[in-house]
């Protein structure tokens, strides 16, 4: 059976692995998931990511980041725009996550950007997720 929302599946796997203190989490690979992983690494939520060959297709493996006493670097993840209800934001009305402490991942005409990057470029788009 096909997956309806692969981005929500990625975020759920990441949330579950983070709450269970796993060091890595694997999932089926796609380009958009790789771009989301790149943003999470740039913002310091994960230590790294890699694409591995699997028996069928490829797997994306994320290395989770924890503090010195195993504090989680990801406090929360929320999927915003869903297949049943798309959420868009104009460049003048981009969301702020926790007053700027978190990150909104936005799909724009310039690719996937954070809310801060989209504001600097002056573009809006589909608000995929919040991470804080």
UniProtKB/Swiss-Prot annotation:
Keywords: Ribonucleoprotein, Ribosomal protein, RNA-binding, rRNA-binding. One of its GO terms (biological process) is translation. InterPro entries: Ribosomal_uS8, Ribosomal_uS8_sf. GO terms for molecular function: rRNA binding; structural constituent of ribosome. One of its GO terms (cellular component) is ribonucleoprotein complex. It comes from the Bacteria. Part of the 30S ribosomal subunit. Contacts proteins S5 and S12. One of the primary rRNA binding proteins, it binds directly to 16S rRNA central domain where it helps coordinate assembly of the platform of the 30S subunit. Belongs to the universal ribosomal protein uS8 family. This is Small ribosomal subunit protein uS8. It comes from Streptomyces avermitilis (strain ATCC 31267 / DSM 46492 / JCM 5070 / NBRC 14893 / NCIMB 12804 / NRRL 8165 / MA-4680). The lineage of its organism: Bacteria, Bacillati, Actinomycetota, Actinomycetes, Kitasatosporales.
């Amino acid at each position: 059976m096909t997956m309806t929302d692969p981005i929500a599946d990625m975020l759920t796997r990441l949330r579950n692995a983070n709450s269970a203190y796993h060091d890595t989490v694997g999932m089926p690979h796609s380009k958009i998931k790789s771009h989301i992983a790149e943003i999470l690494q740039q913002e310091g939520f994960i230590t790294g990511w890699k694409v591995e060959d699997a028996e069928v297709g490829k797997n994306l493996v994320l290395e989770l980041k924890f503090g010195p006493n195993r504090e989680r670097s990801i406090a929360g993840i929320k999927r915003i725009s869903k297949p049943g209800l798309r959420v868009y934001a104009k460049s003048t009305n981009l969301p702020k996550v926790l007053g700027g402490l978190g990150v909104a991942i936005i799909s724009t005409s310039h690719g996937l950007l954070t809310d801060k990057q989209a504001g600097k470029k002056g573009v809006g788009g589909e608000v995929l997720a919040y991470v804080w």
